[in-house]
Amino acid sequence: MERRLVNSTSQSKTESAQQDAGKAVVLLSGGLDSATCVAIARDQGFEVHAISFRYGQRHDGELDRAAKQASLMGVVSHRVIDIDLAQLGGSALVDSSIAVPKSDHVDKIAGDIPVTYVPARNTIFLSYALAVAETLGSRDIFIGVNALDYSGYPDCRPEFIDAFQTMARLATKAGVEDEHSLTIHTPLLHWTKAEIIQRGIELGVDYSQTLSCYDPQGSSDEMRPCGQCDACLLRAKGFAENEIADPAIG
């Protein structure tokens, strides 16, 4: 599914974008990090083509937020790609029989690989992004992975991103013809959640229209965060450190 969004006001480049940087494919989940990534790509002058995934996630209300962010930020196109990772299982995010870990404080988040890790998810998502980028003639992919807040996820590490970029340059027509043809941008990789939020606010991201929760309650378009999963706790910590209220919680 693809929607082309036309909004001359929201598509205007920010003052800091000095020139048209070309097309960029941005992974947009509907969460806080990916929305910030879209804003950063636009601020750098890229023509943003967003992609989202309906992969059997229990928090599929994030896709409603992704559509809203795509519209608010004036992306040129927004694709929603269907992949049924629930067939494979192995994660609390796609298997309702596995409980999402809950806690009352961010310091209690476990340091090992959590059950919310979806096997090979970022490898799969980036592979689709790579195919879309090559089809569009784009040299740039943005993904909002973060190695500080999500250190337990193996596919959020800089080593993984570097390895995938090397693979992409070997496995594509564009890469064979120009070994430096593709760059995977990870602008949030070494930022704290507070720093991500601060930058997003500077760029005008509407965080009221984002959903970070792994186990939200309610219908898809009205899902409310649980407030106790790892994602909720880290998000709350980020807003608290900025001394502002989370606009998504009212």
UniProtKB/Swiss-Prot annotation:
ATP binds at L28, S29, G30, G31, L32, D33, S34, A35, T36, C37, V38. Disulfide bonds: none annotated. One of its GO terms (biological process) is queuosine biosynthetic process. Its EC number is 6.3.4.20. It catalyses: 7-carboxy-7-deazaguanine + NH4(+) + ATP = 7-cyano-7-deazaguanine + ADP + phosphate + H2O + H(+). Keywords: ATP-binding, Ligase, Metal-binding, Nucleotide-binding, Queuosine biosynthesis, Zinc. It is an enzyme of class 6 (ligase). It comes from the Bacteria. Zn(2+) binds at C213, C226, C229, C232. Pathway: Purine metabolism; 7-cyano-7-deazaguanine biosynthesis. GO terms for molecular function: ATP binding; ligase activity, forming carbon-nitrogen bonds; zinc ion binding. Its cofactor is Zn(2+). Binds 1 zinc ion per subunit. CDD domains: QueC-like. Catalyzes the ATP-dependent conversion of 7-carboxy-7-deazaguanine (CDG) to 7-cyano-7-deazaguanine (preQ(0)). HAMAP family: QueC. NCBIfam families: 7-cyano-7-deazaguanine synthase QueC (TIGR00364). Belongs to the QueC family. This is 7-cyano-7-deazaguanine synthase. It comes from Rhodopirellula baltica (strain DSM 10527 / NCIMB 13988 / SH1). The lineage of its organism: Bacteria, Pseudomonadati, Planctomycetota, Planctomycetia, Pirellulales.
